[in-house]
Design a protein with these regions (language model features):
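Primary recognition of RNase H-like, Mg2+-dependent phosphodiesterase/nuclease domains
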Residues: 1-168
């Protein structure tokens, strides 16, 4: 599985995020408490339950709005049925490329949103995070498509005679 993560065709930051999530190495409040830190374990976004990976990424009412806005609620429910983060990551790796890029961008962006809120910035609405996430996933897919075309030899060469400026 670990090699599959690094072979994903997405930005390295998203690969690193998925790797950390699968390794349970994200600095979640419950994990910090278990390691002996004196922290409030309640999830500061909703103040309803403790901050663990399942609640943060899949079960919190605020993140559910993002999943719904992106028409990924069935995927969210499936991911929520898995236990450890490693199983969730394995399932994500088995998704088709469009769903996979949407899910990876959503999870990564929600982690960034959580960190923004922790630092005192305002919480954005679910539709705002969903719109940002959709655009980002579309950009990743467009880059993948362009790279695929270029690797097959279908791209144009910038140095060709038809595009060179000549001085006569």
């Amino acid at each position: 599985m670990w090699g599959e993560i690094w072979k994903l065709n997405c930005p390295n930051g998203i690969k690193h995020f998925l790797w950390r999530m699968a390794h349970n190495s994200l600095a979640l409040c419950c994990k910090l408490k278990r390691r002996g830190m004196d922290v409030d374990t309640s999830y500061f976004v909703c103040r309803r339950l403790d901050e663990d990976g399942g609640h943060l990424f899949l079960k919190c009412k605020y993140v559910k709005q993002v999943w719904c806005e992106m028409n990924l609620n069935e995927t969210r429910e499936r991911l929520a049925s898995y236990g450890p983060a490693k199983e969730v990551a394995e399932h994500i790796l088995r998704l088709d490329s469009e769903h996979q890029s949407n899910v990876l961008c959503l999870l990564n962006n929600w982690w960034c949103e959580r960190n923004r809120i922790r630092e005192g910035e305002r919480k954005r609405e679910g539709w705002e995070v969903a719109a940002i996430t959709s655009r980002q996933a579309d950009e990743i897919r467009n880059l993948q498509h362009k790279e695929h075309i270029t690797s097959r030899g279908g791209g144009s060469r910038s140095g060709s005679a038809s595009t060179r400026n000549s001085k006569d």
